[in-house]
Amino acid sequence: AGLIPPGWFEHWAGVTWATDPEGLRRNPQMLRAPNGVRLDSRDYAQAGRPYWDPAKVTAPTLLVVAEWDQDTPPAMAAAIFPLLVNSPGKRLVMLGEGTHTMLMERNRGVLFQTVQGFLEEAPAS
């Protein structure tokens, strides 16, 4: 069985495309998206320069990563986690059998439960 249940991707795509009527009117159709993340990646990550300081995070923080995530791999979260020295109640959770699109995948319930549990347990900051 695949990671994404039958029909889920098509549903997601339909809902996502509906958020950009301007992109749908273009020929060929396109989904417009902000590219600031790509610029940050080029100017900071690829240059070996951090663009944020994990030590400045003072709110409860949940890092969730999926086992097979190639976009934000578990090693990335594992490297950041110990740097969150001022985050009360920080938590790092690696979820099995998932990718970067886990919110659509068959194990998405575990993701939702993890986030819900953290929100219910986290002290107000």
Model-identified regions with their sequence ranges:
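Alpha/beta-hydrolase
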Residues: 1-62
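Residue-level signal for the nucleotide or nucleotide-sugar donor/cofactor binding architecture
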Residues: 52, 72, 106
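Conserved alpha/beta-hydrolase "acid-adjacent" motif
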Residues: 70-76
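Short helix-capping segments at alpha-helix termini
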Residues: 84-87
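C-terminal alpha-helix
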Residues: 114-125
